[in-house]
Each structure stands twice: as C-alpha cells, then as structure tokens.
C-alpha cells in the first residue's frame, strides 16, 4: 500500500502547483464535491444555504474552508505516509464533531483528482494520477483506522 520514493515525488510535484493557489483549488474541490454529491453539503451548516454554483463561487467562507482542507491535506502528503501525528486530531474532529463518513472522504478524493486533471493536465499524467490515488487511499485508510479506534463507524 505504501508509495515508492518516486511516487511520493510525483505527488509532491503536483502538490506544489496546488500550493500556488490553495484557495482557488480548495474552492473548486468543494464546489465539485457539493455539486457531485449534494448530500455532503448537509454536513456543513455554514454552506447549506448555498444552492447554486454561482453562490458557491461568491462565498468567501467556502473559499477559506477549501484552503483549510487542502492546507491540512498538503501537510499530510508532505509526511510521505508518516502522518500519524497529523491524522489523529483530524480523525478525532471528523469522527466525533463533524461525523464525516469515510465515503465522503472518497468523494472529496475523487474531486481532488478531477481538479488536478483539469487545472494541471501537463503535470498530472497517468503516473502522477496513480501516485496521488495511492496517497489519498493511504490517507483514507488511516482515517478509517482512527475512526474505528474512536468507535465511529462512518
């Protein structure tokens, strides 16, 4: 399940592109998530009222939250699988406070891949996509493992 050094390098190379515009990437990821999986919007009291894509694009709060999500994920990816210290508090809040099911983590992972394909096609070929999929799968597996320890069957 682990990634090779080369795979981590592919992940971090494309992540460097994300970091050039974290709020823009984060906003696009969340809009794709909410449009593609409207049920996920119910977990976000702050965004439930946003019904159209235009309303979502105009929301500074959504942009800020997108930046928060991708900043946290970037911190995890940079640990190259040695991310237990970063995962534990994230799993704790997502299991006990926000009650975000693992399925929703799968949904947002798909959206991240789609945004990277759309925004960075030249830097996100098949090898990079495969590596990012593996990195996001590792993240989800470790979140799920922590959820289980916390007694959350999300």
From Swiss-Prot:
Its EC number is 1.7.-.-, 1.11.1.-. The keyword Heme applies. It is found in: Cytoplasm, Sarcoplasm. Keywords: Cytoplasm, Disease variant, Heme, Iron, Metal-binding, Muscle protein, Oxidoreductase, Oxygen transport, Phosphoprotein, Transport. Residues 2-148 form the Globin domain. Gene3D superfamilies: 6.10.140.2100, 6.10.140.2110. One of its GO terms (cellular component) is cytosol. It comes from the Eukaryota. It is linked to Myopathy, sarcoplasmic body: An autosomal dominant, slowly progressive muscle disorder manifesting in adulthood with proximal and axial weakness that progresses to involve distal muscles. Patients may lose ambulation after a long disease course, and some individuals develop respiratory or cardiac symptoms. Muscle pathology features include sarcoplasmic bodies in skeletal and cardiac muscles. Belongs to the globin family. Monomeric. Monomeric heme protein which primary function is to store oxygen and facilitate its diffusion within muscle tissues. Reversibly binds oxygen through a pentacoordinated heme iron and enables its timely and efficient release as needed during periods of heightened demand. Depending on the oxidative conditions of tissues and cells, and in addition to its ability to bind oxygen, it also has a nitrite reductase activity whereby it regulates the production of bioactive nitric oxide. This is Myoglobin. It comes from Homo sapiens (Human).
């Amino acid at each position: 399940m682990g990634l090779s050094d080369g795979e981590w390098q592919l992940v971090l190379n494309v992540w460097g592109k994300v970091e050039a515009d974290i709020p823009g990437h984060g906003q696009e990821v969340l809009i794709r998530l909410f449009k593609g999986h409207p049920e996920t919007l119910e977990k976000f009291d702050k965004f439930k009222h946003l019904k159209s894509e235009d309303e979502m694009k105009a929301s500074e709060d959504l942009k800020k939250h997108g930046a928060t999500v991708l900043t946290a994920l970037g911190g995890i990816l940079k640990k190259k699988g040695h991310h237990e210290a970063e995962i534990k508090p994230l799993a704790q809040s997502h299991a006990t406070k926000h009650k975000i099911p693992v399925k929703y983590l799968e949904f947002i992972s798909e959206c991240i891949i789609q945004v990277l394909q759309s925004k960075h096609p030249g830097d996100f070929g098949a090898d990079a996509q495969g590596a990012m999929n593996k990195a996001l799968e590792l993240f989800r597996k470790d979140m799920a493992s922590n959820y289980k320890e916390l007694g959350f069957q999300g």
